[in-house]
Amino acid sequence: MTTRKESELEGVTLLGNQGTNYLFEYAPDVLESFPNKHVNRDYFVKFNCPEFTSLCPKTGQPDFATIYISYIPDEKMVESKSLKLYLFSFRNHGDFHEDCMNIIMNDLIELMDPRYIEVWGKFTPRGGISIDPYTNYGKPGTKYEKMAEYRMMNHDLYPETIDNR
């Protein structure tokens, strides 16, 4: 039994679709959203994405990361299968780690207009160096803007606790 009306699921086309088309080039249009039924409260939604891959824009070598996406929804939420396919579309996309995290965040802001969002990539080392770009956003003029500033300043106070290596 569902509490969702069929009209609330109209934009959700990928979930349950047995003929899924896996895209190998960056494809922001694959992202889908659905209405948040709980706009009266703040709550976090967190996605752990341990199989993210992209390509180095200079060498074409693959980069691997675990990406953490956390957000406080407003009116819309991202549908998880569409997010999976969207992240998969970075497989042959050549960009620096920092660019990938900002692109992902910007696309999700455009899709959902969340109250708050953060995207953190923990990339596996290449050449003995790991890169962990963190980016966030809080809706301007709201308490979430202040929250974003606070979390930015405090997001990685204890780097020795990072254990994805």
Curated annotation (Swiss-Prot):
The UniProt entry annotates the active site at 56, 63
Q: How is its activity regulated?
A: Activity is strongly inhibited by Cu(2+) and Fe(3+).
Q: Which SUPFAM superfamilies match?
A: Tetrahydrobiopterin biosynthesis enzymes-like
Protein source organism = Bacillus subtilis (strain 168)
Cofactor details (free text): Does not require a metal cofactor.
Q: What is its EC number?
A: 1.7.1.13
**InterPro entries in the cross-refs:** GTP-CH-I_C/QueF, NADPH_dep_7-cyano-7-deazaG_red, QueF, QueF_type1
Give the keywords, sorted.
Answer: Calcium, Cytoplasm, Magnesium, Metal-binding, NADP, Oxidoreductase, Queuosine biosynthesis
Q: Name one GO molecular function term.
A: metal ion binding
Subunit comment: Forms an asymmetric tunnel-fold homodecamer of two head-to-head facing pentamers, harboring 10 active sites at the intersubunit interfaces.
Q: Which pathway does UniProt place it in?
A: tRNA modification; tRNA-queuosine biosynthesis
Q: Where does substrate bind?
A: 78-80, 97-98
- In which residues is Mg(2+) bound? 163, 165
What is recorded on activity versus pH?
Answer: Optimum pH is 7.5.
This chain belongs to the protein called NADPH-dependent 7-cyano-7-deazaguanine reductase
Q: What superkingdom does the record give?
A: Bacteria
Q: Which Gene3D superfamilies match?
A: 3.30.1130.10
Q: What class of enzyme is it?
A: oxidoreductase
Q: So which residues are the signal peptide here?
A: none
Catalysed reactions, semicolon-separated:
7-aminomethyl-7-carbaguanine + 2 NADP(+) = 7-cyano-7-deazaguanine + 2 NADPH + 3 H(+)
